[in-house]
Amino acid sequence: MNYELTKDFINVHLNDDVNKLALSKFPDDIDKQFVIRQIQARQLLKKKLPSWSENDELLFPKRLSLEQCSSELTAKYKRTISQNDAKTQSRDASMAPAIKHIDTSLHRILVDLTGGMGVDTSFLSDNFDETIYVESQAELCELAEHNFKVLKKNIKVVNAKAEDFLAQCGEVDCIYLDPARRDEYGRKMVSLHDCSPDVAE
């Protein structure tokens, strides 16, 4: 696939009706399925995640992940909450410098156990010195790794189940998770035990 040609094609047809576009003939070196998915994603995210939708270097996953990801407004709000927590930790450390177990250097580590599209991870990472994105789906990990580089975010991507990662994880400052509340068929889950990962365990 010719990436530059594909990107130009997407930008030209960004506002097209994707159903009609899917019936049209595509150049041989452009992946029709990939292009349709990217155009659909940008149209869906135009209001929900404007800064990502407008960045033509970013790549997007299947529709279910788009529907489940946080909006830009929500992700920024979560970032504000974690920023306030950082200020509290900094204040507590400065008030008790003689207590040896308090690390006044405050190298803060965040682990997002439900990485998904990486929206929350990306915004939350601004308040941490080290950020680890954990996701069980390999395709989402590949897309997240690409997008984090585009966004100039220094985030480590780990392809693993949340439970497996936690079993070998060292000490961190913040663990974030937003479990999937829909199954692979898009059906809404009600019980916490049905969510992935099972946060009730």
Regions found by a protein language model. Give the residues of each.
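SAM-dependent transferase fold signal centered on methyltransferase-like domains
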Residues: 1-201
